[in-house]
Regions:
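N-terminal beta1-alpha1 ligand-phosphate binding loop
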Residues: 1-29, 36-42
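Short, structured patches in soluble enzyme cores that scaffold and shape functional sites
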Residues: 7-9, 61, 135
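Structural signal for conserved beta-strand scaffold positions within catalytic alpha/beta enzyme cores
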Residues: 34-37, 131
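A structural signal for short, well-ordered beta-strand segments
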Residues: 7, 35, 55-57, 97-99
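Short, charge-patterned binding micro-sites
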Residues: 36-60
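Flexible, gly/pro- and Lys/Arg-enriched active-site loops
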Residues: 44-51, 63-69, 73-140
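A SAM-dependent methyltransferase catalytic signature shared across enzymes that methylate proteins
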Residues: 31-32, 101
Length: 140
């Protein structure tokens, strides 16, 4: 499977945390094929003085989508992530890893919507911090 992931951090040493996340993804999830440059953005969906550092990557993996989700959530916890939100609202975080798009071995894009996962990510085209880094990967 080919996964397109979005990673972001707005707490601590953001770039270092993203590099650690990429290392963990490469060790635990699959082969990283391409990565975008860092993309800096203001928080989306909440107010914070902490700017985000984001990137996207393409990962070739044998993991099924729910297994990839579990793997990326485990990596988030390893890097200090606790809750996905505070009282149902977005909040500052040391790391966030989202599954954005997934393609099977035949190059067909998967569509999954259930209580755990929505692929393609329903908001990816509305978020410059995802859309622009993804475009960079697609152009390379």
């Amino acid at each position: 499977m080919l996964y397109y992931l979005s990673l972001g951090s707005n707490l601590g040493e953001r770039e270092k945390t993203l590099q650690q996340a990429l290392t963990a993804i490469g060790q635990q999830a699959g082969n990283i094929l391409r990565c975008s440059d860092f993309f800096y953005s203001q928080p989306w969906g909440f107010d914070s003085p902490n700017e985000f550092c984001n990137l996207c990557c393409a990962v070739d993996s044998h993991l099924l989508p729910l297994d990839m989700l579990a793997c990326t959530q485990s990596i988030e916890r390893q890097l200090g992530r606790t809750e996905k939100s505070e009282n149902g609202h977005y909040a500052d975080r040391p790391i966030d890893i989202d599954l954005i798009r997934v393609f099977d071995g035949n190059g067909e894009e998967l569509s999954i919507v259930n209580s755990q996962l929505s692929i393609p990510h329903p908001l990816w085209q509305q978020r410059d911090f995802v859309r622009i880094p993804l475009e960079q990967i697609f152009q390379s």
